[in-house]
Amino acid sequence: LLALERYADATGDTAFLHRPEVEEGVAEILGRLAEKRHPAVALYETFLQPTDDERVYPYLTYDNVLVWRGLRAVARFYSAHTGQAAEAEAVRAAIRTHCVKTDADGAPYFAWSVDLQGHSDVYDEPPGSLQLLPLWGFCDAEDPVYQNTVRQIRAPDYAYSFAGSPIAEIGCPHAPWPWVLSLCNSLLCGHAE
């Protein structure tokens, strides 16, 4: 969905979006998403994290931001799916309600994943980093929740932070060293030193 949006925005070719095979693909994606939606909360479950490693809790903030963005794109380009705009806003609200936690000092941050029973984790993966949320248009780079999130995952005491190293980036268990994808994220987000 995001690739279709980028293609249409870059080329102005919206006719492509209405080819039968593309519309069928969009319908298939929406059907699969519907299977992963929580019955009462507009969050979508995932089994794997961006690295293809198994997740801890079922509702990943980053993945739900992608769902939010994808649903907005569908509503924008497909008149038969304009109702997805309301679902996108429900996802946005659910992320802000359920995926924002507070640290020991009371500062709000985006959790990596949550389970809706109060559990969450502080974590990040360069292939789908929380640092990218402003690039997806989900929040402003000056958003205090975003700023606190970035500060947490780049802090020297975060297990996969390499702050103070020659390449002061983020890793994860999948790649337990400063990952080049993290460097790319930092360049995109203005965090590179």
Where are these regions (language model features)?
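Well-ordered alpha-helical scaffold segments within catalytic/enzyme domains
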Residues: 1-15, 66-81, 129-142, 183-192
